[in-house]
Structure formats: structure tokens, C-alpha cells
Design a protein with these regions (language model features):
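Thiamine diphosphate
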Residues: 1-153
Length: 153
């Protein structure tokens, strides 16, 4: 996604440097949404995982999303880039990418919070057992119950 790209876009530079074409599908959901969801699942309201402006009234990072243009960034590094806001645009971008001879980035717009469920998977992350937040202590109790259900063979 866009969060991972911000940490690892240097891999694209390596592909350009070595003239080894790769096609990058960048799902832009305005932040580290899987971590944001994990925070909320554990009783937090979330902090710092969405690319938002600070709200001038509250002082919190709950303002408008930053207008980051990852396709323009990739192009500035020398890659070919496309944006896809619809399924048809994505199909068109994929066909164009297939015919390119250099690295391609396709920025795909995704609505925040529209990810899939965990499909019975579980990310065992520590949760404080003591907190002034009832949501956090409830999340801690859910974690304890889940751990009690695990049977290791």
C-alpha cells in the first residue's frame, strides 16, 4: 500500500538503476490502514497511521487526508505511472503496463476502512491489562480468551 511504498520506494529506484522492469500496484488507502484497524481492535482510537492534516480545532490528526500523489512521485524518479480510480481504469493501466519496457507504478484508489476481514486469522499483539479506557481493558479480556482457546500440538 501507500504506507509501505513510503518506506520502500528505494526498491523501485534499484529496478530503474538496474534496468529490471517491475510493475508496482500501489493501493492508496491514505495510510497504514491495517495498523490503524489493529489499533482500533485493541481499544485505541488510533494514532498516526493515517496521512491526515492536524485538525486546528482539536489538535488531533483527524483533518483532511494529505493530497499525496504517488504516481507523480514515481514518475519523478523515472518510472512510468498511471492512476486508477475505477475498475476500467485499472484494466487499462494494467494493459499499458504490460507493454512498457521500464518500471511501472499503478496508483489504485481504495477507500479507507474497506479492507477484508481477517478470515479467522489473528494477530497476537499485547494489550495493556490495566487502563483507564474501558475499550482497552475489554480488548485485553478478549485477547486472554482467545489465547485460552489456542491448542498447540
Amino acid at each position: 500500500g501507500d504506507g509501505g511504498y513510503l518506506m520502500l520506494h528505494s526498491e523501485m529506484i534499484t529496478s530503474l538503476q538496474e534496468k529490471k522492469k517491475i510493475t508496482i500496484l500501489l493501493f492508496n488507502n491514505h495510510g497504514f490502514q491495517c495498523i490503524h484497524n489493529l489499533q482500533r481492535e485493541h481499544g485505541s482510537d488510533g494514532f498516526g497511521n493515517e496521512f491526515r492534516y492536524r485538525d486546528e480545532t482539536t489538535g488531533r490528526l483527524t483533518g483532511e487526508y494529505l493530497p499525496l500523489d504517488f504516481a507523480a512521485h514515481a514518475a519523478s524518479l523515472g518510472a512510468k505511472s498511471y492512476k486508477a480510480h475505477t475498475a476500467e481504469q485499472l484494466k487499462d493501466a494494467l494493459l499499458k503496463a504490460k507493454n512498457e519496457t521500464t518500471t511501472v507504478l499503478i496508483e489504485i484508489s481504495v477507500l479507507p476502512g474497506s479492507g477484508t476481514d481477517g478470515y479467522e486469522s489473528w494477530w497476537n499483539v499485547g494489550v495493556p491489562e490495566v487502563s483507564v479506557s474501558e475499550k482497552v481493558t475489554a480488548a485485553s479480556e478478549r485477547r486472554k480468551q482467545r489465547l485460552a482457546e489456542i491448542h498447540i500440538i
